[in-house]
């Protein structure tokens, strides 16, 4: 969706609109002040290629005015430059201007000097009514206290100076603003006083000049919204939960019309109910956990499946905006007087790493592309081509769908369909993070309407622990009746909404998940791309290997043979083809527009479309690496340095990856990156100390990664300056980590000297058996503690440009 200053953005009670038409965007959070400015454009392109339409970003007050009156919009704090990069990448933007943000920042983003203006200390974020004269406070934070509002106005004015010229009405990227965060839920006032404060902040922002079509506010946990669009959230776990034990299954894996996540912010005190009328607002999310930020006491590891399954459940439950927090991890900037992370020392409930805000996000702290990125991209591809129609499909609860998140036996299902029931999707989830779900072999899958009528019958499907998917169905008008077909595409006679039996109608329902459309509405043939999940053909059809499958190292069934002939008949009549992928292939697939024609590309690297449509591939540079690229349709010319595999063209309607054209290229990488670790004796301490030397860091590398596998409570690296007379500052960190059991990945390119080298002092702190911390898997504690480095490796992240003659 391309917007301009003439575009009219609004919303109905069901969805967002652009010029009156439904719009289903994908939004992802990135904090410009937690990234290097020279990396912004590169990382924004990755976000766009991951399916993000709108970036959201906190403007964190303490990052801009740590010292009262000393404003800093330079370097990583240069909001104006960031907005120009957002525009350059063709993205849109929501700025979350607070003034309180949270974001695991010191004081929730409030500068220390502002907090100290309260004469009497209060619990972090807690508001006290101005009428409480007994306290005789000079100022009450997060209230309509005139003094507080005067500081907020000054902050808003500074942010506006940076944003001016970048609003949508000026052909800029800013389409929306969020006021405050979790107000009335994590601090602030509730009830009429809270609503009035939210309206006051919005009014102030408008007076200053902020002019956007969309204004939002936190909607969960009793937060007040001031009449603005409520946005919801949901996380697969709760690292803020004070417990250090395994916690109950998340409610975010249950299909439900309820929008409230009762777990968010439980460390600050929980408001039980939402405060707005759900019937008046669309179901939008701004804080679906793209990952999880670990805390000192609780360190769950979010996976790609954790996030994708949760996202699918939200789609099935009627959500019409997928907004992820965080989409891109980062590193806290260095403070001028203090460190800038959330900590118990400042009265907040959790201790966070001083620097790392990795979040196990789809794009990690140093821009590493993850499985989560690929899985979110897969959903986003579907939404870009089918989302506007999905917006108009209502959520319909299904019989047998459980309401208890702890029910690991019942199959979880939902339907979204058009009001007349003529078209829709059946959503199925048999995945709950870190839980074993009951298998459902040969289960009859049916989609039911609100009146109990069968909308679609998918026949018998094997559903196993960990499966989640959605299948399409629709009504087709036929020339004659059809008998029930028990093949993989089921057809049903159906009574329509008037209760009459229409003999010339049937239901088409296929157990494949749509991925995207190629060349819809263009002069070329339209290709419907989908991927398969069903296992019932395994024994009957046997395994089928293709070149793509061989390279992916996966097994595939002949999905084409698992679909009934009526599918081909239908596609032929509509002038379409169906391209079927396996699960693994779909994770490596992307669309690319070249010369006005859309192509589906599958590669063993990550294909990124950049400025002016240029294509590049990101992958780890290894010796004798082969890059392969599959395309449908065949590219007009072979990329430079690639060889094309000659193949026969198949005229059929049903296609799979054997019908794609293969291009291969031998890469002449000569890895230069090396690292050496030298352990130091620490006789007086159980800490592990080491010197790390890295060399061969080259400018052409996108990133130079050092990967440390360690066991301990935490670790940090301090850079040793080049020989220049400087002494090592013990308090100046280059990177840090809370141990989770995952390898610690550090991007060191930013630390390289002119000689391509960097040196660090590494400290690993011991993890003791009695430590009050939740870990998914503990290391060997036979000595009563763990403190060691088990492995060291390096990884060169390379960018390979695809050039065409």
Where are these regions (language model features)?
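Aromatic-lined ligand-binding clefts that engage carbohydrates, nucleic acids, or primary amines
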Residues: 695-733, 737-738, 763
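Carbohydrate-binding surfaces of carbohydrate-active enzymes
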Residues: 117, 126, 137-138, 148-164, ...
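Glycoside hydrolase catalytic-domain groove-lining segments
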Residues: 226-296, 352
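Substrate-binding cleft/loops of secretory-pathway carbohydrate-active enzymes
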Residues: 186-206, 210, 218-258, 403-406, ...
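The substrate-binding groove and active-site-proximal loops of carbohydrate-active enzymes
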Residues: 25-36, 61-77, 134-154, 180-194, ...
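N-terminal carbohydrate-binding accessory modules
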Residues: 1-54
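Aromatic- and acidic-residue-enriched segments that line the glycan-binding/catalytic groove
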Residues: 69-77, 99-136, 189-194, 198, ...
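Aromatic-lined substrate-binding rim segments of carbohydrate-active enzymes
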Residues: 41-108, 206
């Amino acid at each position: 969706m391309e917007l301009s200053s003439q575009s009219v953005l609004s919303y109905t009670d069901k969805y967002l609109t652009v010029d009156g038409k439904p719009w289903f965007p994908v939004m992802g959070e990135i904090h410009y002040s937690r990234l290097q400015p020279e990396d912004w454009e590169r990382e924004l392109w990755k976000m766009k290629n991951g399916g993000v339409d709108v970036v959201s970003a906190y403007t964190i007050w303490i990052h801009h005015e740590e010292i009262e009156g000393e404003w800093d919009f330079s370097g990583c704090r240069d909001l104006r430059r960031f907005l120009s990069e957002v525009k350059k990448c063709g993205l849109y933007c929501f700025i979350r201007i607070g003034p309180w943000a949270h974001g695991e920042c010191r004081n929730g983003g409030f500068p220390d000097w502002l907090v100290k203006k309260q004469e009497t200390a209060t619990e972090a974020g807690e508001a006290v009514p101005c009428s409480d004269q007994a306290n005789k406070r000079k100022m009450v934070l997060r209230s309509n206290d005139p003094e507080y509002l005067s500081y907020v106005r000054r902050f808003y004015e500074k942010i506006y100076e940076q944003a001016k010229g970048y609003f949508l009405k000026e052909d800029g990227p800013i389409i929306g603003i969020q006021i405050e965060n979790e107000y009335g839920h994590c601090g602030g006032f509730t009830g009429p006083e809270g609503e009035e404060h939210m309206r006051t902040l919005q009014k102030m922002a408008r007076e200053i000049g902020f002019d956007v079509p969309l204004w939002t506010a936190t909607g969960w946990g009793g937060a007040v919204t001031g009449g603005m669009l409520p946005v919801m959230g949901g996380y697969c776990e709760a690292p803020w939960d004070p417990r250090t034990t395994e916690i109950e299954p998340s409610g975010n894996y249950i299909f439900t019309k309820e929008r409230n996540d009762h777990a968010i912010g439980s460390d600050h005190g929980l408001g039980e109910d939402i405060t707005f009328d759900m019937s008046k607002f669309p179901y939008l999310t701004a804080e679906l956990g793209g990952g999880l930020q670990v805390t000192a006491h609780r360190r769950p590891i979010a996976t790609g499946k954790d996030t994708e399954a949760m996202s699918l459940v939200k789609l099935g439950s009627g959500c019409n905006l997928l907004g992820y927090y965080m989409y891109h991890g980062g590193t806290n900037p260095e403070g001028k007087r203090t460190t800038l992370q959330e900590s118990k020392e400042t009265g907040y409930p959790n201790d966070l790493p001083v620097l790392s805000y990795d979040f196990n996000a789809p794009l990690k702290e140093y821009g590493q592309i993850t499985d989560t990125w690929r899985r979110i991209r897969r959903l986003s591809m579907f939404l870009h081509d089918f989302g506007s129609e999905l917006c108009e499909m209502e959520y319909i609860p299904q019989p047998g769908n459980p309401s208890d998140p702890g029910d690991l036996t019942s199959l979880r299902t939902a339907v979204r369909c058009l009001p007349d029931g003529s078209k829709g999707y059946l959503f199925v989830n048999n995945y709950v993070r870190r839980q074993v779900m009951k298998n459902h072999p040969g289960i009859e899958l049916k989609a039911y309407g609100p009146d109990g009528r069968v909308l679609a019958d998918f026949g018998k499907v094997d559903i196993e622990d960990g499966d989640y998917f959605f299948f399409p169905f629709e009504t087709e008008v036929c020339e004659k009746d059809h008998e029930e077909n028990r093949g993989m595409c089921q057809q049903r006679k159906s009574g329509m909404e008037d209760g009459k039996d229409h003999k010339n109608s049937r239901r088409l329902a296929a157990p494949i998940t749509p991925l995207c459309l190629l060349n819809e509405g263009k002069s070329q043939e339209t290709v419907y791309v989908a991927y398969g999940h069903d296992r019932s053909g395994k024994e009957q059809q046997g395994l089928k290997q293709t070149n793509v499958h061989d390279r992916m190292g996966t097994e595939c069934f002949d999905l084409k043979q698992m679909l009934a002939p009526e599918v081909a008949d239908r596609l032929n009549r509509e002038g379409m083809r169906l391209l079927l992928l396996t699960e693994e292939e779909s994770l490596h697939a992307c669309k690319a527009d070249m010369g006005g024609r859309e192509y589906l590309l599958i590669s063993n690297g990550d294909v990124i479309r950049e400025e002016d449509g240029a294509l590049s591939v990101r992958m780890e540079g290894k010796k004798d690496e082969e890059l392969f690229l599959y395309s449908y349709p065949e590219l007009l010319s072979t990329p430079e340095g690639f060889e094309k595999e000659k193949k026969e063209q198949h005229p059929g309607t049903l296609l799979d990856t054997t019908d794609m054209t293969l291009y291969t290229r031998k890469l002449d990488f000569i890895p230069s990156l090396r690292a050496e670790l030298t352990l130091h004796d620490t006789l007086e301490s159980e800490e592990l100390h080491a010197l790390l030397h890295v060399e061969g860091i080259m400018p052409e590398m996108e990133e130079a990664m050092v990967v440390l596998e360690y066991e301990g409570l935490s670790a940090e690296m301090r850079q040793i300056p080049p020989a220049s007379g400087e002494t090592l500052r013990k308090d100046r960190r280059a990177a840090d980590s809370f141990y989770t059991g995952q390898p610690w990945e550090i991007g060191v390119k930013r630390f390289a000297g002119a000689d391509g080298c960097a040196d660090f002092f590494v400290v690993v702190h011991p993890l003791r058996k009695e430590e009050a911390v939740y870990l998914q898997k503990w290391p060997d504690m036979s000595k009563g503690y763990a403190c060691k480095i088990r492995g060291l490796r390096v990884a060169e992240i390379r960018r390979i440009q695809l050039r065409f003659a």
